[in-house]
Curated annotation (Swiss-Prot):
This is Translational regulator CsrA. Keywords: Activator, Cytoplasm, Repressor, RNA-binding, Translation regulation. The gene is csrA. GO terms for biological process: mRNA catabolic process; negative regulation of translational initiation; positive regulation of translational initiation; regulation of carbohydrate metabolic process. Transmembrane segments: none annotated. It is found in: Cytoplasm. HAMAP family: CsrA (MF_00167). Coiled coil: none annotated. Its main location: cytoplasm.
Length: 63
């Protein structure tokens, strides 16, 4: 896992088309903004897991 340090207002790039910007830090919560093309899905992990479960398969499980 790559670990990066960013301050509020700073951005990191994922490939050529996705940017992740730190919008704010309050206590133990970090607000981030993700700018990605329409064809790239962006979800919180718990939402992604729910979508996968509804599709009938858990990521990483042997089927």
């Amino acid at each position: 896992m790559l670990i990066l340090t960013r301050r509020v207002g700073e951005t990191l790039m994922v490939g050529d088309d996705v940017t992740v910007t730190v919008l704010g830090v309050k206590g133990n919560q970090v607000r981030i903004g993700v700018n990605a093309p329409k064809e790239v899905s962006v979800h919180r992990e718990e939402i992604y897991m729910r979508i996968q479960a509804e599709k009938g398969g858990q990521p990483g499980s042997a089927e």
